[in-house]
């Protein structure tokens, strides 16, 4: 009986040592892919709150900074700013962060004119002066010319903008959603197909805003069923407006032949 117990204890001890080896950091590291290993070794982790100095602007208008030479993208941050950020995604070569606090503010930062800014996905740079926007666009082209084209960036001339940077869009495409009796009409939220309710956009031609508001009221009055892209059911999908010198064009995109 004693011999049997000793054998059993030896087996348990071996299994315990094997288990410890398999759960060691070295063993876990060996089981990870290169991508997973890179994420594990990143200087920031999901949920970290870090200070980031912004030195550039990304292709979607987000601020670009670095933490220990690791790139961090921060929406609504501007070059020259130091910001406090909550890391909300970590990839192999970069992370993204949510802006918590502006520690050092850029001289050309302003309050956005649109009360839906930051929710609607239509605009990304309303928090900077228009002159600042033009300067950022010029610098973006210079960076591409130099880094990818291997040309002298001084060849790029300053970006020219209109005298009035508002109410210039002559075409509007507005998604429709919600439910029958509670229709929603506006623009998609950033990075999603969730609709931000709003029929008055400051960068749209005023004619398009009139079209949007009229269609919204008519859809409510006649209780038209909005299209649901998840179920594939419903009627009204989009409102399209186009303003030209010869007149206005209004298009209703539906999922059925009749309203």
State each model region's role.
Residues 2-259:
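Accessory RNA-recognition modules of RNA-modification enzymes
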